[in-house]
Amino acid sequence: MHDEEQIKILEPNLLILASAGSGKTYQLGNRVIGLVAKGNKPEKIVALTFTRKAAGEFADSVLTKLAKAASDPHEAADLEQRIGLEPTNFDTVLATVVRSLPRFNLGTIDSFFAKIVRSFQYEFGITGGKFDLLEGPRASAIADEILASVISSRLDAEGRDSKFLHAFRRATMGRESQSVLKALSKFIETWHEQYRNADDVQWGPPGIAHVNLDEWEKQKHTLANAAIDGIRSIIFTDKRQTDALQDSIEEIRNHTIGSGNLSNSSKSLTKNILEAVATQSNTLVVKSYKDFTLDGTTGDAIREMVELAAQCELTAAFRRTAAIRDVVRIYDELCESQLRKKGLLGFSDVKYLMGEWKKNEAARLKREAIDFRIDASIDHWLLDEFQDTSNADWNGLWPLINEAASDDASRTLFVVGDRKQAIYGWRGGDVGLFKKITDEHLPGITTAPMYRSYRSCPEVLELINKICGDTATMHSLFGETSPSWEWENHVSAPHLQSETKRGHSRVEWIENDEGRLDRLVAILNELEVGKRNMTCGVLVRSNEQVTEISEHLRANGFDVIEEGRRKPATDNQPGIAITQLLEWLANPADRFARGVLEMSPLADILRNLHGNDWNAMWESLTREISIHGFSTPLAAVITPIAVDWSEFGRRRANDLLAALADFDATGCKSPRDATEWIERLEIAQSPGVAAVQVMTIHKSKGLGFDVVALPNIPDKAVPQTQHFEIARGEQWISDTPPAWVRRMSPEIDEAESRWAAAQRYEAICMLYVALTRAKRGLYVLLDRPGKNTDVEKASLSNWIQHSAKNSESTDEILFESGKSNWFTLIEPLEAAKLPSPLGKLQNPVRKRATVTPSQSKNKTHAPTHSPSGMKFGSEVHALMEQVTWIDDSTPALPKSDAADAVAKLIASPTIASLLKRNGKSIDLFREQSADAIVDGQLMTGIIDRLHLHRDSSGIVTRVEIIDYKTDAVASAHDLVDRYSGQMQAYQSTLQKIHPNAEVVPILISVKHAELVYL
């Protein structure tokens, strides 16, 4: 075992394989602190991870360590020893880091890529509009709009409707039961990324002999009849086999291509026949009660029948693949024309641009020019959670990292990850990149494993080691995995081995689902969860299980939080009642909403406050809302009855009232908009102590809980072959035929084998992640095997059953380590307090009046704009937006009056000097929005061009505000009277942002090609 205390954290190129709980965030923080302490500038360090939460934790870790070291000599000495530093002034290091935080590249890979594309959008070919990143609900809404447009009547006008529907019918061949929109959404979700990254990939596996699909219907009856006619020559070994064989032949005869009938056959003999034909052996030995051989005319006819059906199924899959490509291509063309060409890009588009250099020489040269400019600003790379890195991520990063890692020791690479926690393969994570780094890209990189746990006590690790270290059982159940599972036993850090830190682990049997939930409640009650100062996580595989278990625990008195996020409008009864109140206010004719209100406790309060007549009630309440906003009137309705609600219900009501107060601040008084506001509301939450957090295992990654319960260990075989949707070869991609057909296609069979090996590895990693969340208590519930249970099935449940069992196992408890009363070592919480009242909300903030800087111009001189003049002005602004620094690149201008005017501006020596960088450190912004509070009003405007001059330390010393004016004035100086108010408003705003800088407003007269300084 490698001792992490021996790791030289400042080794130039270092790969740390950090097991769960071993302190990877700690090592990342030490690396950054060491680099800065050695004199490296924080802004030349890039640290990338996969979630904003992880990035925030990393930043907190760095600042907390530095603050402790700066204030405590003992902490300073310990940090120096761990990092390998000479005596260090951590006050200075802390100050350096804090000053550099705005320029410190700490965040997600996605945000880093977006930052690069935003900085070099024109170099990346985004010229149709300003780069705008689509993410979250906005991205989903736009995708839905495009999907709707694909199947809308607008396609008729484009002449695409018949083409699209034809492709779609082929894509859904044999699967017509799905709705059009549902099927299309599934295709897009499954295939769009494949399409964008498949420029040189064949759609459909090679070497497949296509047949006419009609051949099956033409020949199946002849072949089936021949098979039945020859049955008498078969030597049966059981009298029941004759009828069974006839039934199977009829079942095969009744099969329809694409229907999936044979895949779902309940007849064991039919399955036997399909498997026997797939082996391509000379004789067909099958089993029905006993083994017997299908030979003679019957055997030949059955073999020919099954092989013909398989060929037709393969052809159908190939045609579906081609049709899917056509459907996704139409969708992608709409994305290109409606989004990407206009600068609207999602994270996947950004990754595509960052990895485009691999596709052709022109793209490589373009990326090389961009990297040359970026490379000088980055010396040190830190990559976190490397097992979750996708090939798309790596392709985008590698050109930059390659420069740093192959340079001298002044430039470094630090990678940390854990192969055993690779649970995001389904979204592209490629654990094989570890091998690619060590074997191909950086064969000289130092590798250091970490197995000591700073999270889990010895009793928890005993169970983890027993299960995850049992590679013999793993291999016998699961066979080969990709990659292979590597294990070394974990040990607890010394401070966790003291008697006061000990814990307990147990694996026990449950009889059924009802018993599972009741036993879970009993375990949490036995441990006094909610009464002692400890955290508890209940981890499951699916969102449906999260909901089921949360509701059951809540009904049994536990304070429960799901998934770390809450939806207060829909996940509780008070929230539903409040939402329906808003629905009724939005539409008083909504009978359902009113019915919910009449059955809820809100009805009596509404009558007391606003009268018994519902029409008068609606008018009274909407009148109050028009005066006070939504939060105050609704708080008056809720508060009188909230005292009778659970703590959970009161929290949810407070969430909604706070959200409505935020909505009131927008100035909107529409009940419909208010309803949509709270229905979309999701609030991040921290469970704290005394709360039970129920979440999926994926969501739990990176977290730790004093108590972990795993009540739903899957007993299904791994993998579930019905989830094999895309077959991939080195140079091809295909939709998948039914499972029985795949055995008859070597290419697809091999592709499925690779997929299955990866699925098995990910399932093993999933269980490892779940087990290693536990600090002090780990409780696993397993279904008790029945008489017909296949205990050799490749399931996670069987793995635990085989590995955890020992000589002390009983009928109730399979494994146990430690003392069940360990929780008494944890202090109790304070006695329960009285129910907390609804929080008092501040008065809603009135929406500020909005003004624009252009309203500040002198109205007596305001020109009257003609449509042609406005069009000319818009064209000039659009062309000038494309102008970067003319000493770096010359803009390509079209032939137009506006282009001639822009060319004239660039030719002017005084204006040209303003548009040149001349090697200075200047940040350039075009069409920059500017918002500020001026005299109590919200000022909002767009600055045509903004220059921020920085000194050698990065401080802004001069700000140039540049506005282009196309007014037909007699003299350029006539613009001063017209626009001095507007420019002074901009100047005042920028002066507040940069108080120590010189702020210079500049007008450019397009008509006279002159500069005017104000």
Residue ranges of each PLM-predicted region?
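Conserved motor-region signature of P-loop NTPase helicases/translocases
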Residues: 1-64, 137, 141, 145, ...
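Conserved ATP-driven helicase/translocase motor core recognized via long
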Residues: 19, 44, 177-345, 716, ...
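Conserved ATP-dependent motor core of P-loop NTPases, especially the RecA-like helicase ATPase domain
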Residues: 5, 9-11, 49, 66-259, ...
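Nuclease catalytic cores
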Residues: 55, 59, 461, 692, ...
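Accessory C-terminal helicase-associated subdomains
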Residues: 322-326, 340-344, 501, 526-532, ...
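Flexible, glycine/threonine-enriched loop-and-boundary segments that flank and lead into catalytic domains
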Residues: 355-380, 392-407, 675-699, 908-948
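Accessory N-terminal region flanking or inserted into the helicase ATPase core
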Residues: 1-17, 27, 44-46, 123-131, ...
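C-terminal accessory regions
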Residues: 607-632, 686-692, 740-800
